[in-house]
């Protein structure tokens, strides 16, 4: 409010008045009071936005600085079959990029496998809506797959893990 008091009344204009080109001196006292209130309200709104952005930034910085924010739990770190070894692929937790390394599996069969997870056994893959040619391709790699216990921490990135070539 002290900021508003230090501004000459001639320069304070509301958006409507600036369109008409009228300053506060040319207005009635009640209109001048309303215009001053509008300016104060706008200043308070900007102050509120600045405080919100500052608080949100501080919260984000605290979260981003925390090593636990992006780390999997200790149990998740021991999950195998995520694609490092193509002869041992966990169909419940492997990312779609793993299937790119298996000719004929990507993109159609891979999307169906990931979309239908979790599975109790590899045999459940044949209950997916696959053509005979796709089932033949699946049989080709069947010995490379196993149905591990689904890990919630890995489920969110099964289609796009954010790692690009």
Swiss-Prot record:
GO cellular component: cyanelle thylakoid membrane; extrinsic component of membrane; photosystem II
Subcellular location, principal: plastid
Entry keyword Transport: yes
Signal peptide span: none
Residue span of the annotated presequence: 1-45, 46-65
Function: One of the extrinsic, lumenal subunits of photosystem II (PSII). PSII is a light-driven water plastoquinone oxidoreductase, using light energy to abstract electrons from H(2)O, generating a proton gradient subsequently used for ATP formation. The extrinsic proteins stabilize the structure of photosystem II oxygen-evolving complex (OEC), the ion environment of oxygen evolution and protect the OEC against heat-induced inactivation.
Membership in a protein family: Belongs to the PsbU family.
The protein, known as: Photosystem II extrinsic protein U, cyanelle
Species of provenance: Cyanophora paradoxa
This protein's encoding gene: psbU
